[in-house]
């Protein structure tokens, strides 16, 4: 009695798969395997063997005459491939006695672009084994064809190209086709060339442009960062200084640098006008002039830095020139009652501008409220603490002896009464 598995044993699945696979059918690759050969592998291991009629290891490249179809019809005729497809295709001559290939297709033509790229062997000899040419498909007829996204890479052997060049040089026609009438000439240029077809997409380029735009927006936002941290750092620096004396020492006695103008943010930072306690309260982030002015008005007593502003600076700075437009020249015949302009006066030289008058800090001596204790040059910025008496002190009215001496040191001229000018408007 024969055992059931003695003679009727089944072949392994791999053997059955080889038996079921027919010549010309698509190969069955295991999951994860892709057919992605290099240019050298395509020429050496596939095109050379195909031209020499040597059997290929697998039937993975179909034999199709590419110029009888449009490129969008070729994927369904390929044996293998998802995004790119490989074919063995013959090439015909464009003219019977020429060496130029015929690139015409069904509804368009293939146009060569760029220069031919030589394909070198990877051995020590580094010999040239083939040539690679890139072509683009155009709809319509030349030269008014419409460019498409279909690309072809054509691989040919160097021996074939050299023989074709020899034929073109000697102008010897190819052998006639046997059985043809009147000795018809064969238009076959190459028996086989290997072609790779794929469609170019712009998704990667669009995504890259989108990422570049996002990066540029982020860079712009980072470049225009809020300046609150910078202002907080400046306020903390005021708080860390040792009162007004520390500020004066830091500036080397030149109080003209106590007013800092930030041209990028259009804000003004006044350093040294507040006490250490006031500056410590502002260290949390005072970033605008209105907050600084409110804190100055809320001060209980005048700070020492305000009084020290009466001392002359080594390099006098014209505050009116920095904050006010240049004054117009007033004719000497103008007259108006003093109630319109009070007791204010200007330099006796009428043609001098207001920028030559200098600056004097105001200290009305009202220590109870401290609201009037502010430098005169802050008033053009809109600080409400400047009063009518401050205007008098600015323009050279009656001042204490110390203030008069400071005014003389700041190049003040003799008072001159102006009329028909309303300085309060």
UniProtKB/Swiss-Prot annotation:
Its main location: nucleus. Residues 129-206 bind DNA. InterPro entries: NAC-dom (IPR003441), NAC_dom_sf (IPR036093). GO terms for biological process: regulation of DNA-templated transcription; system development. Residues 12-23 have a biased composition (Low complexity). GO terms for cellular component: nucleus. Residues 1-34 are annotated as: Disordered. Residues 29-200 form the NAC domain. Residues 1-10 have a biased composition (Polar residues). Keywords: DNA-binding, Nucleus, Transcription, Transcription regulation. Transcription factor of the NAC family associated with male fertility. This is NAC transcription factor ONAC010. It comes from Oryza sativa subsp. indica (Rice). The lineage of its organism: Eukaryota, Viridiplantae, Streptophyta, Embryophyta, Tracheophyta.
């Amino acid at each position: 009695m024969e055992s059931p598995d003695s003679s009727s044993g089944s072949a392994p699945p791999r053997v059955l798969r080889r038996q079921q696979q027919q010549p010309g059918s698509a190969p069955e690759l295991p999951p994860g395997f892709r057919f992605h050969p290099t240019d050298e592998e395509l020429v050496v291991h596939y095109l050379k063997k195909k031209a020499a009629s040597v059997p290929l290891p697998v039937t993975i490249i179909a034999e199709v005459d590419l110029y009888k179809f449009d490129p969008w019809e070729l994927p369904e005729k390929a044996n293998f491939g998802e995004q790119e497809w490989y074919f063995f295709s013959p090439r015909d001559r464009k003219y019977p006695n020429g060496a130029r290939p015929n690139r015409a297709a069904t509804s368009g033509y293939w146009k060569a672009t760029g220069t031919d790229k030589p394909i070198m062997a990877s051995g020590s000899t580094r010999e040239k084994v083939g040539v690679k040419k890139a072509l683009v498909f155009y709809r319509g007829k030349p030269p008014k064809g419409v460019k498409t996204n279909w690309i072809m890479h054509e691989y040919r052997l160097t021996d074939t190209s050299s023989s074709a060049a020899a034929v073109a040089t000697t102008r010897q026609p190819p052998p006639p086709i046997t059985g043809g009438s009147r000795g018809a000439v064969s238009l076959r240029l190459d028996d086989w060339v290997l072609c790779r077809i794929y469609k170019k997409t712009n998704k990667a380029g669009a995504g890259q442009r989108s990422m570049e735009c996002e990066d540029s927006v982020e860079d712009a936002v980072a470049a225009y960062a809020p300046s609150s941290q910078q202002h907080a750092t400046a306020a903390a620096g005021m708080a860390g200084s040792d009162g007004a004396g520390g500020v004066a020492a830091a500036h080397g006695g030149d109080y003209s640098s106590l007013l800092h103008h930030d041209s990028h943010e259009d804000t003004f930072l006044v350093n040294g006008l507040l006490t250490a306690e006031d500056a410590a309260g502002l260290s949390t982030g005072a970033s605008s002039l209105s907050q600084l002015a409110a804190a100055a008005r809320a001060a209980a007593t005048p700070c020492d830095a305000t009084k020290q502003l009466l001392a002359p600076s080594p390099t006098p700075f014209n505050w009116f020139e920095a904050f006010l437009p240049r004054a117009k020249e007033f004719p000497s015949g103008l007259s108006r009652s003093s109630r319109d302009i009070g007791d204010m006066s200007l330099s006796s030289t009428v043609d001098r501008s207001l920028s030559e008058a200098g600056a004097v800090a105001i200290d009305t001596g009202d220590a109870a409220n401290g609201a009037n204790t502010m430098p005169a040059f802050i008033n053009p910025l809109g600080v409400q603490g400047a009063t009518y008496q401050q205007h008098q002190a600015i323009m050279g009215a009656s001042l204490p002896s110390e203030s008069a001496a400071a005014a003389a040191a700041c190049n003040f001229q003799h008072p001159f009464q102006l009329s028909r000018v309303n300085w309060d408007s």
